[in-house]
Amino acid sequence: MYKEPFGVKVDFETGIIEGAKKSVRRLSDMEGYFVDERAWKELVEKEDPVVYEVYAVEQEEKEGDLNFATTVLYPGKVGKEFFFTKGHFHAKLDRAEVYVALKGKGGMLLQTPEGDAKWISMEPGTVVYVPPYWAHRTVNIGDEPFIFLAIYPADAGHDYGTIAEKGFSKIVIEENGEVKVVDNPRWKK
């Protein structure tokens, strides 16, 4: 029996996919991710903002199938550090992914298991290929929601634990009105 093809609407202005599974990440869900822990705590106690929302259309976890999702990453900073997604490796490290920027201004921070990092700027129309074995995190460097579409193998899985434990070797900050990618003082090899 063949699987049934389908189509869904994606609202490029809001990032919402009709009928998708929605998940929400608040700043309080990201304890330990930002370098300035004091600024993180103050912002959580003051308002605990939504950092990002994901709208996912997922298939059965099997080789050959694809999942897709949009992420709405809101503007903001913790200290000097721009809001970002938690970031992850794939549980099956040899799986790749494709991201398409739909709205806003941001970028992707990518990293090998050894900590070699690369920054790719993203604006509407930018397509980023994430090769196998690279961790990846998106960052909103603008003043409006940064919205993108991700397409990835259904069996890729997500390894958030490695990033939660070690972090990324680089962070993205605003300094003197400029976006800078700098060494993460807390990164663990």
Curated annotation (Swiss-Prot):
It is found in: Cytoplasm. It catalyses: alpha-D-glucose 6-phosphate = beta-D-fructose 6-phosphate. It comes from the Archaea. Pfam families: GPI (PF06560). Pathway: Carbohydrate degradation; glycolysis; D-glyceraldehyde 3-phosphate and glycerone phosphate from D-glucose: step 2/4. Binds 1 Fe cation per subunit. Inhibited by mannose 6-phosphate, fructose 1-phosphate and fructose 1,6-bisphosphate. Its cofactor is Fe cation. One of its GO terms (cellular component) is cytoplasm. GO terms for biological process: gluconeogenesis; glycolytic process. Optimum pH is 7.0. CDD domains: cupin_PGI. Fe cation binds at H88, H90, E97, H136. One of its GO terms (molecular function) is glucose-6-phosphate isomerase activity. Its main location: cytoplasm. Keywords: Cytoplasm, Gluconeogenesis, Glycolysis, Iron, Isomerase, Metal-binding. Its EC number is 5.3.1.9. Optimum temperature is 90-96 degrees Celsius. Highly thermostable. HAMAP family: G6P_isomerase_arch (MF_01410). Belongs to the archaeal-type GPI family. PANTHER family: CUPIN TYPE-2 DOMAIN-CONTAINING PROTEIN, OXALATE-BINDING PROTEIN. Homodimer. This is Glucose-6-phosphate isomerase. It comes from Pyrococcus furiosus (strain ATCC 43587 / DSM 3638 / JCM 8422 / Vc1).
